[in-house]
């Protein structure tokens, strides 16, 4: 190596060693982070919808914890519209927020927005649902595969093998839909008679109509598994309207209406999540990142099987 090349190499090494900042956190390769206190942070939050008690609870958890930490917060409701969510995220990027918290409408569609944030060196934190690409600081979610499996195992335990079952799935393309279906169907295809699986978009009214149509031709159904409580509540209405007895209704989320339905006997069980806690964990991840603390690539929030026997124990 020539003398000049050697000198230049040494200068580059010394320059790299002398850099200030907090270095790289997972999902933010290449970005030097300036240390900030919580009260100096400006965060953008994109919620998939506020027309669902689960995501309302998540938003409330975010609002409450951010308020406690004196964080400046901008929240946008995507109204279950992936294009609208993309616009909201672009607005956050234009406003140069310190981090963007995203609860994706669609795990594939959101990738473009995540990459745009990556290009702007803005950390991205995902809540409840993952993405199919882009770099994220962390994903805060329940183990949705395990939630689906837990529901299926409970059904097999209650009804035995080969029980006739319907499945109501969520928004096509959402990671929660894919993962809950994967967990449920892994058990169901071996141990249940899965008569039909149809999407109702995580929506109560759509689930009511879909379940009514499913029931018409197959009134010997023994259980309806819904990938969230809103759909489970719609299915419960359909079962009641059809005059069917002893049909198990199992959901996921643990929302207050589901707890009431379990107490009344309209629903059988739910796999409870902690949406408000997820929101709190996501905010804390942003704080930790700007304090130079290591942020785990994924943070799992606990889930619980809730039945009439323990319905008063688990609340949001």
Locate predicted features.
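Sec-dependent N-terminal signal peptides of Gram-positive bacterial secreted proteins and lipoproteins
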Residues: 1-22
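A residue-level marker of the well-folded mature domains of exported/periplasmic proteins
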Residues: 16-316
